[in-house]
């Protein structure tokens, strides 16, 4: 994997670039739809390609490990062979999911024991077997296995957690270097910067990660309940240290406003379940504001969902989508999910254009003001 930094904004830290993988190029800034179990919920890959224009999707190591399981994925030739997606894939390490299993997990220096949320069976994730698992899944970008401490952890817990995450990172890198890709395409490993909301821990973590010389770096443990201004401050602290010639990935974030603010602070890659989750709940982001498609006000509105959006936005009226939600039709959630994902991809594409034009900061300010409206 390579990263070419193309443009840097004169008035902010926003930048554009191109990530090149064996499965294709990714223009940054980029939003990555989340395909937890190897699929993006409610959206066919053909729609992801043509309507959403997704350049890369995510897979979830925890969920894929449990179901369908590694034997099936390996027999299919990796996740690309199993699900038929021919563009880049990134897999998280499963750490966030495992550490969300409060009460059914046990943490130690070795790794994390946990019970499956499916059948209660017992498993363990270690830095070594997570690297092996991600090799079998075969994603173009693999994430290191880290501990994800609760967002409001006290300083001592956060420090202890970070120290273990750093030891685990060394083990991940060692295992990664000892193993080879299984399916004929290269894979890259991204370390993750943790440290909760403590500046000194974030700086320490960023320096530790930067020194590893990885192909790209991630920022984790944010958007977990802290005020947004604190999140932005942590991004600034970390990006002052992370190398400028490598892509920076902010994990699990977030709203359109969050994404634009993070782009301004030098972040290149994003993922979040919000587009599909909010879409399934009838809440639609647009450049004019947020619409609740269950509201009666749309009952007789025959204008397009978004006249400047993807093809489905243009041919579907607000009244029709309102009707589908009120009738409980699955098509409503599908249309809304496609709209949302296409909107997120359009947002980062427009951000890229304005960074190149040199007016990103002004454009962002006007867009954020509109995005906050309820219509």
Language-model segments: which ranges?
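C-terminal extensions of enzymes
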Residues: 1-20, 26-33, 41-42, 146-152, ...
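Glycine-rich phosphate/ribose-binding loops and adjacent secondary-structure elements
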Residues: 163-166, 179, 184-305
């Amino acid at each position: 994997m390579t990263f070419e930094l193309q443009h840097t904004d004169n008035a902010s830290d926003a930048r554009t670039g191109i990530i090149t993988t064996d499965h294709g190029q990714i223009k940054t800034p980029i939003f990555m739809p989340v395909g937890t179990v190897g699929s993006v919920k409610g959206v066919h890959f053909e729609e992801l390609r043509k309507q959403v224009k997704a350049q890369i999707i995510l897979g979830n190591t925890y969920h894929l490990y449990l179901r369908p399981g590694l034997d099936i994925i390996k027999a299919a030739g990796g996740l690309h062979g199993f699900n038929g997606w021919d563009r880049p894939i990134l897999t998280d390490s499963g750490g966030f999911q495992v550490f969300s299993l409060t009460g059914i997990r046990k943490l130690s220096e070795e790794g994390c024991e946990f019970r499956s949320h499916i059948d209660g069976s017992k498993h363990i994730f270690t830095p070594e077997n997570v690297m092996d698992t991600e090799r079998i899944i075969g994603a173009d970008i693999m994430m290191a296995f880290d501990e994800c401490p609760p967002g409001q952890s006290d300083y001592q817990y956060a420090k202890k957690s970070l120290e273990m995450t750093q030891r685990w990172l060394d083990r991940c890198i060692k295992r990664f270097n000892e193993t080879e890709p299984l399916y004929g395409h290269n894979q890259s490993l991204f370390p993750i910067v943790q440290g909760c909301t403590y500046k000194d821990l974030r700086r320490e973590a960023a320096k530790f990660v930067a020194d590893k010389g990885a192909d790209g770096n991630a920022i984790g443990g944010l958007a977990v309940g802290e005020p947004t201004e604190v999140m932005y401050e942590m991004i600034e602290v970390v990006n002052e240290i992370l190398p400028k010639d490598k892509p920076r990935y902010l994990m699990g974030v977030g709203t359109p406003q969050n994404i634009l603010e993070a782009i301004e602070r030098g972040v290149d890659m994003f993922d979040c379940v919000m587009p599909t989750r909010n879409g399934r709940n009838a809440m639609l982001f647009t450049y004019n504001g947020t619409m609740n498609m269950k509201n009666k006000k749309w009952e007789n509105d025959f204008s397009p969902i978004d006249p400047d959006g993807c093809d489905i936005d243009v041919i579907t009226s607000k009244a029709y989508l309102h009707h589908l939600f009120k009738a409980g039709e699955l098509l409503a959630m599908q249309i809304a999910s496609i709209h949302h994902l296409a909107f997120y991809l359009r947002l980062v594409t427009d951000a890229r254009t304005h960074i190149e034009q040199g007016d990103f900061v002004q454009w962002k300010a006007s867009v954020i003001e509109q995005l906050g409206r309820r219509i």
